[in-house]
Amino acid sequence: GLLNARLALTIYMEFKKNAKKSYHLQLKIANAIVPELLGVLDESAERMLPARWVNLAANSKVLPSSKDLFSVQAVSGKNSKVWMHTHGMTRCHMTELEILESDQANYNNHFNLLSIYAMYCLDKGEAFDPRIESAYIGQLINGYPVVVTCRSWTEAIFEYKKLQLGGEK
């Protein structure tokens, strides 16, 4: 199995204008070089891809979804606080996204929010700059719009009065 493998192949690829095409090419290269692969570690997105999925995606005429280009991770801390963040966006020339101080009651909603916003950014590509434009990404059950604004963490950090980064002291 995968844990007993003695060889590994690393492919590093900076994605160009069309991130989905670049990712598809990366999967095709991995599948062609190692046709009997056990799996692919997508290091940028920090996730394992099953060999069967890689083979199907590489041989498909349909490009992978934008949701395949990144992952959303949740790190829980004290007081039920959860730090949510993406991995894989920077290879697409986009900023990684995060939500600080989510909580146990809302982290699933925040996971969906980050996922939808990341897909929105990737699908828009270079035509959209999240640092300048807001994005309407949906509507709540009560009819209120969901509008997302991306802010640099160096600015947004001041909105968290009691937040401590990097440890307890």
Regions found by a protein language model. Name each.
Residues 1-75:
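Internal, hydrophobic cores of structured domains that mediate oligomerization or house catalytic pockets
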Residues 48-169:
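Aromatic/basic-lined ligand-recognition segments
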